[in-house]
């Protein structure tokens, strides 16, 4: 029913997909044509997609910091290196907590984890270790800035949708609070990376473009697979 209602309000000659249109159209303008059951179906589909990609993102972040910590921890000969290693471990601990949160939410909301976790397991570690090997402290921080900028924007988009779909019948309040808290910590990681002179790394600009594009592709894939 939900899909039929959406299909009926999309022009037949429209070049955008049903999924794209449903994201552009204000939820309340759709909801007034739907039954309580259909609203619940849309909400469940939204949460399934959101939690799958959020779990995948935090899993990847955990692996990035694992790779960085392993490389940076191999040489603690200077105060600067010890400082960076401590900082990376602090952010890693927060990412571990984020991952634990989504590992609990996945079964709670009956969401399906992405099938791409083995890929993100390897890719995240390689990205983290590689950035620290090639760029040291600034290289590691550059990756943090790029990834967290993308993730923060992603969480902001999700929060807007969850607020839009919030209702007395289907409350998203607790989930909004959780994602907002995680979003704020990701923003702190981004800002910390800038404070640690990520932008002074000579590869900062090209790496930022590549990593942000990779993150967006990973989000797109994890939502669907």
Where are each of the predicted segments found?
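Non-heme di-metal
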Residues: 2-225
């Amino acid at each position: 029913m939900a899909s039929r209602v959406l299909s009926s309000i999309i022009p037949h000659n429209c070049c955008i997909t049903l999924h794209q249109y449903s994201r552009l159209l204000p939820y309340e303008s759709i909801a007034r044509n739907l039954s309580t059951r259909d609203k619940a179906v849309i909400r469940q589909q939204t949460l399934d997609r959101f939690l799958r990609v959020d779990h995948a993102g935090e899993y990847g972040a955990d692996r990035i910091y694992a790779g960085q910590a392993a490389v940076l921890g191999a040489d603690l000969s200077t105060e600067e290196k010890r400082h960076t290693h401590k900082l990376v471990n602090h952010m890693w601990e927060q990412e571990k907590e984020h991952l634990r949160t989504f590992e609990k939410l996945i079964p709670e909301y009956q969401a399906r984890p992405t099938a791409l976790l083995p890929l993100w397991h390897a890719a995240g570690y390689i990205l983290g270790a590689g950035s620290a090997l090639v760029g040291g402290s600034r290289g590691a921080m550059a990756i943090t800035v790029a990834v967290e900028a993308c993730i923060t924007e992603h969480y902001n988009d999700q929060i807007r949708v969850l607020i839009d779909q919030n209702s007395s019948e289907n409350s998203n309040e607790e989930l909004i609070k959780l994602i907002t808290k995680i979003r704020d910590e990701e923003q702190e990681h981004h800002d910390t990376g800038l404070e640690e002179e990520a932008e002074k790394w000579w590869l900062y600009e090209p790496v930022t473009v590549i990593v942000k594009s990779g993150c967006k592709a990973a989000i797109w894939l994890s939502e669907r697979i």
